[in-house]
């Protein structure tokens, strides 16, 4: 009879512990949901017609803030963004650097393959190219091989 009472006591204790755990999880879930709802309601974005001082100042100077998005109208916009030997060009109405842009490598719409990278206007495999080993313009020494982007990988 003593053994039976012990088993019943253990089962009763376990069932009470499970009920308390379920109640705690249920209450904390409800609190989390209400906190989320109140946080979402207070985070509504209020927009005004006012422009910041910085943007207003640039607009007053006559500078077109979206000039790079409209380079077909003025070809020289792209050239002015780079230096003297600039490789900037206007492709698909955007200013791009033909030396390092993977979608316009060397010429407009010349897209590099999936594992290739545009270096100096040509598509190369950084993992195996001796002139661009691991990164653009990182050359391996004479007699070394580029393997997995490392010179003389052993």
Swiss-Prot record:
Top-rank taxon of the source lineage equals: Eukaryota
Q: Does the keyword Ribosomal protein apply?
A: no
Q: Name one Pfam family in it.
A: Stig1
Signal peptide bounds: 1-23
Q: Which UniProt keywords apply?
A: Signal
Q: Which residues form a coiled coil?
A: none
Similarity-based family = Belongs to the STIG1 family.
Name of the molecule in the record = Stigma-specific STIG1-like protein 3
In the record, what lineage is assigned to the organism producing the protein? Eukaryota, Viridiplantae, Streptophyta, Embryophyta, Tracheophyta
């Amino acid at each position: 009879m003593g053994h039976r009472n012990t088993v019943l006591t253990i089962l009763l204790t376990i069932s009470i512990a499970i009920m308390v755990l379920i109640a705690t999880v249920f209450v904390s879930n409800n609190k989390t949901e209400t906190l989320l709802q109140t946080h979402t309601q207070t985070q509504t974005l209020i927009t005004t017609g006012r422009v910041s001082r910085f943007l207003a100042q640039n607009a007053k100077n006559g500078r077109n803030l979206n000039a790079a998005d409209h380079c077909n109208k003025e070809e020289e916009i792209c050239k002015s963004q780079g230096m003297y030997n600039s490789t900037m060009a206007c492709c698909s109405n955007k200013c791009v650097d033909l030396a390092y842009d993977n979608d316009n490598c060397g010429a407009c719409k010349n897209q590099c393959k999936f594992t290739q990278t545009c270096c100096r206007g040509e598509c190369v495999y950084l993992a195996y190219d001796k002139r661009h080993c691991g990164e653009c313009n990182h050359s391996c020494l004479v007699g070394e091989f580029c393997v997995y982007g490392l010179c003389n990988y052993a």
